[in-house]
Amino acid sequence: MLAFIQGELAEVKENYVVVDNNGMGYEIFIPHTVHSYLPAIGDKVKFHTYLQVREDGMALFGFLNREDLAMFKLLITVNGIGPKGAIGILSAISTDDLRFAVLAEDVKAISKAPGIGTKTASKLILELKDKFKLEDAFEATFQSNQVISTGGKGNNDGIREEAIQALVALGYSATDALKAVKAVEITSNMTSEDVLKFSLRNF
């Protein structure tokens, strides 16, 4: 219904902002992580939005990019997690880190979000883990470095998986291992040992 709202940033509070669009002020709930990316009061801003409609009223939830909105929509499909719970999760952990945590089945990382215990975190992982693939976590890396090995993306995925497993065996958490390996730019002649070596430099 409301795909996005664009206008002047009129007010900023801890949990929400007010956007002035043609004389109408829209109250939009946002993750805390958005605050550091907001423009100055009076400047133009655009939020990709989700409209919650309930018997007792409506509420708008907004994000600065479509990726965060997409993750929010996935989170509210999990039984027991509503829009405000999803906002709380995305206030505590970024979309990228949340994707890594789900792939790594890292209950501890997800349960750091306010109001999310280990039981809910486990349920979230169970219901969303099939929504992501390892290549999703590395998609930004593929797009940014434009390095394609002779074996293709699939071969790189195999090398990455071996490096991740090695890091976990060394005692690093699965989430930290995923993030460290993601930061490595892989070229066609690299082995999993090379990726492991460069990944260790990211700790």
UniProtKB/Swiss-Prot annotation:
Concerning InterPro entries, the annotation shows: DNA_helicase_Holl-junc_RuvA_I, Hlx-hairpin-Hlx_DNA-bd_motif, NA-bd_OB-fold, RuvA, RuvA_2-like, RuvA_C, RuvA_C_sf
- Assembly and interaction partners: Homotetramer. Forms an RuvA(8)-RuvB(12)-Holliday junction (HJ) complex. HJ DNA is sandwiched between 2 RuvA tetramers; dsDNA enters through RuvA and exits via RuvB. An RuvB hexamer assembles on each DNA strand where it exits the tetramer. Each RuvB hexamer is contacted by two RuvA subunits (via domain III) on 2 adjacent RuvB subunits; this complex drives branch migration. In the full resolvosome a probable DNA-RuvA(4)-RuvB(12)-RuvC(2) complex forms which resolves the HJ.
Identify the stretch(es) annotated as Flexible linker: 144-154
Recorded GO cellular component terms are: cytoplasm; Holliday junction helicase complex; Holliday junction resolvase complex
Q: Which family does it belong to?
A: Belongs to the RuvA family.
Q: What is this protein called?
A: Holliday junction branch migration complex subunit RuvA
What does the record give as the organism's lineage?
Answer: Bacteria, Bacillati, Bacillota, Clostridia, Lachnospirales
**Subcellular localization, as worded in the UniProt entry:** Cytoplasm
Summary of the function given for this chain in its UniProt record: The RuvA-RuvB-RuvC complex processes Holliday junction (HJ) DNA during genetic recombination and DNA repair, while the RuvA-RuvB complex plays an important role in the rescue of blocked DNA replication forks via replication fork reversal (RFR). RuvA specifically binds to HJ cruciform DNA, conferring on it an open structure. The RuvB hexamer acts as an ATP-dependent pump, pulling dsDNA into and through the RuvAB complex. HJ branch migration allows RuvC to scan DNA until it finds its consensus sequence, where it cleaves and resolves the cruciform DNA.
- Which gene produces this protein? ruvA
